[in-house]
UniProtKB/Swiss-Prot annotation:
It comes from Methanosarcina mazei (strain ATCC BAA-159 / DSM 3647 / Goe1 / Go1 / JCM 11833 / OCM 88) (Methanosarcina frisia). The keyword Cell inner membrane does not apply. Part of a complex that catalyzes the reversible cleavage of acetyl-CoA, allowing growth on acetate as sole source of carbon and energy. The alpha-epsilon subcomponent functions as a carbon monoxide dehydrogenase. The precise role of the epsilon subunit is unclear; it may have a stabilizing role within the alpha(2)epsilon(2) component and/or be involved in electron transfer to FAD during a potential FAD-mediated CO oxidation. Pathway: One-carbon metabolism; methanogenesis from acetate. NCBIfam families: cdhB. This is Acetyl-CoA decarbonylase/synthase complex subunit epsilon 1.
Length: 170
């Protein structure tokens, strides 16, 4: 079992509510309990090692994929259905309870984020944390303080092992 709760020290933590560090088994439980989950992926997912795991996560948990940046091509090349959306626009939409979602069935209650630059996703999740009831779970290598839950700062090898463990637990 990979310990993904390590290395979560913050340097700017005064007055900030930070995310809870979690292990892959807890993430799997949260995904299974979500009523309307959405898997949000960034451009970093195009690395073959990560893309294969992202596809397995989405398929095994039956989660729709919101591809941001240039990540859509990787999923389309693998024959996986994914919808493109700008990350900042998605963050804005998630704060609107009346948003119909990417599939027209309503807003999402949980988002799972993977492979974003830390400084970029933290800003988007700041909006969802403060202006919506959406739970955000980061399964990337970096600890994301504005997520509801996040893996800690882990090595690439530990990250791959954690994603494999998550897939096994779904």
């Amino acid at each position: 079992m990979v310990d993904t709760t390590k290395n979560t020290k913050l340097f700017t933590s005064y007055g900030v509510t930070t995310s809870k560090a979690v292990n892959p088994d807890m993430v799997a439980k949260m995904i299974s309990k979500a009523k309307r989950p959405l898997f949000v992926v960034g451009t970093g997912v195009l690395r073959p090692e990560v893309l294969d795991r992202a596809v397995k996560i989405a398929q095994k948990a039956n989660i729709p994929i919101a591809a941001t940046g240039s990540s859509l091509k990787g999923f389309l090349d693998k024959g996986v259905d994914a919808k493109y959306i700008n990350l900042h626009q998605l963050g804005f939409y998630l704060t609107d309870p009346a948003w119909p979602g990417l599939d027209g069935k309503g807003n999402y209650d949980t988002i799972i984020v993977l492979e974003f630059k830390k400084y970029y996703i933290n800003q988007v999740l700041s909006g969802t944390k403060n202006f919506s009831n959406v739970k955000a779970i980061s399964i990337g290598r970096d600890y994301i303080q504005n997520a509801t839950m996040s893996f800690g700062n882990i090595s690439r090898e530990d990250h791959y092992a954690a994603l494999d463990e998550l897939i096994d637990n779904l």
